[in-house]
């Protein structure tokens, strides 16, 4: 489905509400290459929110016990302006439109945000939030990726110009995302307008460098900065080092309860999965990669914060002595009981 037909058929397809949830699975696959000595992959269930920022900022999306979008509302999951790019006093839609216009010259009419919602309005973590940007002809013309790394909790903003809906976007990696993968990689992303299904396919190609040639002192780019685009042909023969695929189906907000109950604390689970898979990679012999110069260095407070978050995530996910399914059933039962009070 093209982006223009998606807009035209919206009233019939999504009951005139563009904001909703998407539920499915995410696959991560690490390939053996220079600086990575193993193949390693995993798949986890996920759900994310797709938010029409005009609807959110106009107060058109109804709040519920399960998810809310207004300040001061109590809910299991919550959208918070402060979690995202720009000044908290400025609307997020305006911040993204200005960013894209300044970077590309494109005039943006509408912005959709794909993201994790915060747990209880207290904690949020997004490995990547994606802003889909549409022009006056209702075509997807740009995307903004707001990438967070761990454990440093830096952010990098990538502004990607999309010539055609089904084009692949290729650019150089310049942000230290993982302590078990260096920066000498290039990205290839396949982004299309979310419809009944949401599919994102991204791969990372290893640059043709010998291990001894890697510049470990190359600058680390964070925050808002231009990115370097490259042609797909220039890296087509480079080895694939990493593959990510997100495959989800749409869930209407009126049906949010079942979706959210499957994973009420999605940001905490994301932190848990990242740390568990990192431990597996480290255990299997992949070397730790120190952060590049100019990146924020970890301190004692950061280490304690991550230990606390990991501990909470582990307890919420697995319990202390209660099996995981019993723990989840008990937690979900409490939420349902609280809803009826």
What are these regions (language model features)?
Residues 2-341:
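Mature, function-bearing regions of proteins
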């Amino acid at each position: 489905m093209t982006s223009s037909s998606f807009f035209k058929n919206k009233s019939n397809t999504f009951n005139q509400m563009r904001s909703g949830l998407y539920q499915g699975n995410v696959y991560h696959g690490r390939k053996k290459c220079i600086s990575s000595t193993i193949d390693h992959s995993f798949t986890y269930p996920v759900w994310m929110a797709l938010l029409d920022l005009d609807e959110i900022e106009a107060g058109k999306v109804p709040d519920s016990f399960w998810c809310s979008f207004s300040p001061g509302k109590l809910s299991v999951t919550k959208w918070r302006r402060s979690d995202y790019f720009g000044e908290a006093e400025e609307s997020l839609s305006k911040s993204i439109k200005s960013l894209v216009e300044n970077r590309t010259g494109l005039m943006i009419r509408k912005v959709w945000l794909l993201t994790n919602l915060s747990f209880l309005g207290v904690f949020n973590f997004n490995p990547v939030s994606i802003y889909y940007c549409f022009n006056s002809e209702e075509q997807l013309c740009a995307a903004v990726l707001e990438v967070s790394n761990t454990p440093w909790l830096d952010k990098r903003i990538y502004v990607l110009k999309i010539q055609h809906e089904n084009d692949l976007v290729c650019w150089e990696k310049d942000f230290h995302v993982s302590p078990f993968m260096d920066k000498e990689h290039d990205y290839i992303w396949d982004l299309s307008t979310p419809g009944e299904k949401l599919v994102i396919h991204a791969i990372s190609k290893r640059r043709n460098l010998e291990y001894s040639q890697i510049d470990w002192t190359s600058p680390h780019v964070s925050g808002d900065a231009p990115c370097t685009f490259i042609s797909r042909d220039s890296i087509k023969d480079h080895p694939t080092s990493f593959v990510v695929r997100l495959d989800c189906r749409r869930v209407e907000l009126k049906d949010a309860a079942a979706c959210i109950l499957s994973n009420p604390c999605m940001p905490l689970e994301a932190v848990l999965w990242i740390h568990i898979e990192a431990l597996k990679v480290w255990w299997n012999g992949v070397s730790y990669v120190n952060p590049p110069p100019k990146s924020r260095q970890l301190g004692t407070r950061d280490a304690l914060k991550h230990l606390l978050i990991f501990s909470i995530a582990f307890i919420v996910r697995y319990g202390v002595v209660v099996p995981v399914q019993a723990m989840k059933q008990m937690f979900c039962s409490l939420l349902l009981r609280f809803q009826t009070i």
